[in-house]
Amino acid sequence: MSKALLEDLKWRGLIAQSTDAKELETALSKPISLYVGFDPTAPSLHLGNLVVLLVLRRFQLAGHRPIPLVGGATGLVGDPSGKNEERTLNDEKVVTDWVAKIKKQLEKVIDFSDKKTGAIMANNLDWTKPVSALEFLRDIGTVSYTHLTLPTNREV
């Protein structure tokens, strides 16, 4: 089944290359869980989401469990598409509403039933909201180095 799934995805142009095709085939020989992230920066998914949704559905039909990960925390930060202007911050109630609307759209493509392959909706706000800024800085700040992310060329 795993080889058939991979061949189907390749035939459809959905796999261009793979680091270790044999290892991937071996991993898919038993049921796995896989996720795709969706940012709720609008009340609806867009056409660009369709391809990954169809891939999730194909994996589900092949016996695997999809986990659509909705970035509720990311949605609160706002849409980064306007690179030359400050992001518009979204209200938590608005983002919560968008998450619910997106789930309804996801339910039209993937199965959220209690079956072994039933999709599980995850929201990164569930595990990021309880973390305070101080906790985050203590846990992450001690192992990340800002100077590595700054440009070496200081010209603006």
Residue ranges and their predicted role:
Residues 83-88, 138-141:
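Short, hinge-like loop/turn segments at secondary-structure boundaries
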Residues 90-113:
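A glycine-rich helix N-cap at a beta->alpha junction
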Residues 107-122, 148:
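Short secondary-structure capping/junction motifs at helix and strand boundaries
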Residues 146-152:
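Conserved small/polar residues in nucleotide/adenosyl-binding loops
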Residues 9, 46, 121:
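Divalent metal-coordination and catalytic microenvironments
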Residues 125-130:
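Short, internal active-site loops enriched in acidic
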Residues 24-80:
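N-terminal catalytic cores of NTP/NDP-binding nucleotidyl/phosphoryl-transfer enzymes
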Residues 1-40:
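Non-catalytic terminal extensions that flank enzyme cores
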